[in-house]
């Protein structure tokens, strides 16, 4: 694991500044306590239905109740180990690099695949040794089992520490290592702490001029035009086209609101038809693993446009050279690049994607043959861009001067696009207007992190008063609404951010709330499963006492919907493992959440994905309703539902896509769907244990879906299926 990492390994979350980031689906914090006999980790886990956090205990030994299955089942380890192209490249490079007994260091060892490859390359010679460090205790426990299964326990010294905690000459590592093997890479390349890890290793853990696998990484970028990508950040211009009269980004206050200036991982192959290439690929940075890297770097390059257009985004990727001779490569480039290269096109995988850097506003207009100036820089964890038409050089990142102190409210790109979508806004506006009808002096309570609904309620009724809980955005939301009040034509005394919690709210406003509303949207749950936004119902239940007799709750109900899908790429990336480059990995399947040949009684979890980014996909059935949740009433107990799938197309069914439809009013006149037809929402995916062949004629398998959800205890949706 990289030295700066305080999080478990292999996450899917975006990069943060100042520390390394790993690849779990949700960010967690872990604290370690150890003794001579065992080790114990306290890991912070958040309940998405309440926002509350609790410490859970992970024991070094496998005592009942301390299973790590749930902690690793949502990680990308399985996807990575199913990436055969990556596995083969590492095997070939390790066999080519390690030709005699030596001391090998594996940083961020995971299941131990690279360590075992190194042992095999030394042919089990007792003069050779492998030191493997892995900081996350659940993964350490799993690696021990894999090592034992493959007879490698005596050949690998596994240490449950970060690499920067190792000291040469101690019981951890007797001497400096001759060879470094590692895979501390994310989609951006640097986000898992590659640079600080290499710096510490070269300073403290490796011999001079060591051998390394990989040998070098090179980043590339390409200028593109894409209306879809532009919509993910340009709220100001999209909002100007709407007719609701509400302005999230009023003129002159653009600095208040936007996305973070960072790289965003994305499968750009899925939108290839929506992308216009404006330049040839450009080489940006080289990082040599075999020597100590610098913490920061800069590059200025002039890029010639090969066609006329507007630069809406910069797409980036990297290429690994795994051996020193330059014969073994691995690339994360888009298919339109690799299809024309010697490296070739890799199979779809989710653990490494391309990255997108957004150009602010409407982009940079360029003409064919014109050159634009790109300033690229990197920190220890990020690669940054600044694109200009002028030839004047600047080493500053693009930003708007803040006009209201340091306030800058940041939202994910998909949320920015949703707020700029005229259809979504019109639906929300009409639903809010309808909910306010007949109420003279309405007291409105917005219980989620919506930015649109408070403004719409204030705009539609000039006698309304709005309370907002903003549980995720908190004080920043309050400051934001205060800053845009004048531009939206309401006095600040009509809006209140209630900061004293739901319990005190119930005491302060008993029976006084006429309208309880939400989109629902909770900051921090964007990468979660769709039904986790049923936190709205949980909060509504807790606040039942504040509602007046004729209070309106919006949305009126939530509907869990689904459809059967052909998902060959996703299923292949999450299927159970057998032999990985000659090493038995069958025992990791349950722990890592595999689908396929799991033991009886075990099942793979529901995972959140943008369906449109999941490689080849096809909808095979009619959409169906699994469960309905009536928000007009408090939660009274567990919910359940079952449905028989009605197929409309032949094919192979790999899984079920699940999402929420929000019915905004009792008459069902306004329904906001988060299904796979829209690219701005993630869906939940439940992969089948075995793919099912569907025929339209003759005998064919039938699939029944059963689901249950107990919101009084947790947000885990239990989905099972029967095949007949």
Curated annotation (Swiss-Prot):
Name the record gives this protein: Protein arginine N-methyltransferase 1.6
Q: What Gene3D superfamilies does the record tag this protein with?
A: Hnrnp arginine n-methyltransferase1, Vaccinia Virus protein VP39
Q: Which InterPro entries match?
A: Arg_MeTrfase, MeTrfase_PRMT7, PRMT_dom, SAM-dependent_MTases_sf
Top-level taxon of the source organism: Eukaryota
Matching Pfam families? PRMT_C
Q: What is the source species?
A: Arabidopsis thaliana (Mouse-ear cress)
Annotated TM spans = none
Keywords for this protein: Methyltransferase, Repeat, S-adenosyl-L-methionine, Transferase
Q: What does this protein do?
A: Arginine methyltransferase that can both catalyze the formation of omega-N monomethylarginine (MMA) and symmetrical dimethylarginine (sDMA).
Which EC number(s) does UniProt give? 2.1.1.-
Domain SAM-dependent MTase PRMT-type: start-end pairs? 61-388, 395-721
Q: Which family does it belong to?
A: Belongs to the class I-like SAM-binding methyltransferase superfamily. Protein arginine N-methyltransferase family. PRMT7 subfamily.
Which GO biological-process labels does this protein carry?
methylation
The active site consists of 183, 192
What GO molecular function terms would the record report?
protein-arginine N-methyltransferase activity
